[in-house]
Amino acid sequence: MAKLGKKILVLLALVILCLGMLPAHQVGKDRAKAADMQTFVKKLMKKKRIAGSIAVVHNGTVQVVSYGRAKKGLKNGAKNVVYPAASLQKQVTAAMVMQLMAEKQGSSKFFSQNTKISRWYPGLRGASKITVGNLLTHTSGLQIPEIEVDRGVTYSEAGAVNWVVNRLNQASQDAVGTYHYSDVNYILLAGIIRKVTGKSYAANFKKRIVNRLGLRHTFLIGKVPAKYQVAASYDYQNSKNYQNRRYLSKTRLSQLIGAAQLITTPSDYYEFVSALGTGQLLAPSTYRLMTHLKSKKTRYCSGFYIKKGGKVKLAYGALGGAHYASYYQLTSDNQNGIVMMINQRSCGEDKLKGIGYQILQKLELNTFSQT
């Protein structure tokens, strides 16, 4: 019996030793893969003359790779550097609208994707034919070509929304159901959030998104603490990096409530996207509704595009007059993909997505969309 007991103890010791060795071996492999990816991404960014920060997600693990400078004397990747997300904010606004749809069920403030926006905008011409779903899918027929032109005025939230309503009443409108990608739709949605809650968009954003997820590097323009630095944007020109430095003016961004005021980092934005449909921000059923609205006419729905038969999702954002660009593409389960926030480029949307696609191909061959 004593010998048998010793054998059992020896076997147990061997099992424990083996169990201890396997994770260490796996950790070594994972570290090697991470180092390989970091080298690959940095070399690619250098070759393509882009600077910024990219979150690379592999099997649910996030690795942030940064290259170049945020401004003179400050590198991308520093803890205090944040970036304009441009149109990537639209998904945030859509998520808050969906939260309110779910919360207000059974109350006098209940609304659905089919509710006409004349409830909140009785003075807007044609509002009795436009639904909340039309705004979320850019099928309202509304657009203002000059919506992103800096008017040189620092608008309050209400002032930005009211300007849009007044301008729309002066402009020609296409039939409801016509697809026009326009900030107008999401500015009106921001106004609805204000009217339904009786609180500012900023207050809702902080409560419903930032505080709920514990995001520490995510703000709206005008609300960025002094210790954080919004990266400057640059062009690559005449074989030189960091040319034509540009920032986005606060007056211009104040016009774009709900559409393009977001300041964040790739890792924080990934935290937001990956929380959708988990119960942290939206229940799975609410998230499914968010991505399958009846008014959807293209692959765009609620702030992003759904492609490859629902296997991947993506969005791109940029504002003219500066060199920033933001882009993400993730698998539907959020386990693999990238979030890019770029502050130097000399290429347009298609070429930047092409750079991203090279990273995506290294992650998961032939899984992601090229466009």
Enumerate the language-model features and the residues they cover:
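Short, gly/Ser/Thr-rich active-site loops of penicillin-recognizing serine hydrolases
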Residues: 346-371
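Short, Gly/Ser/Thr-enriched beta-strand-loop segments that form substrate-interacting elements
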Residues: 293-332, 339-344
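Sec-dependent N-terminal signal peptides of Gram-positive bacterial secreted proteins and lipoproteins
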Residues: 2-26
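Active-site SXXK
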Residues: 54, 60, 82-113, 186-194, ...
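Short, conserved catalytic-motif segment at the N-terminal edge
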Residues: 37-83, 105, 109
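Catalytic-site signature segments of enzymes, centered on catalytic residues
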Residues: 149-226, 256, 260
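Penicillin-binding protein/beta-lactamase superfamily catalytic region
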Residues: 224-296
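Active-site helix/loop module of the DD-peptidase/beta-lactamase fold
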Residues: 84-87, 102-147, 195-234
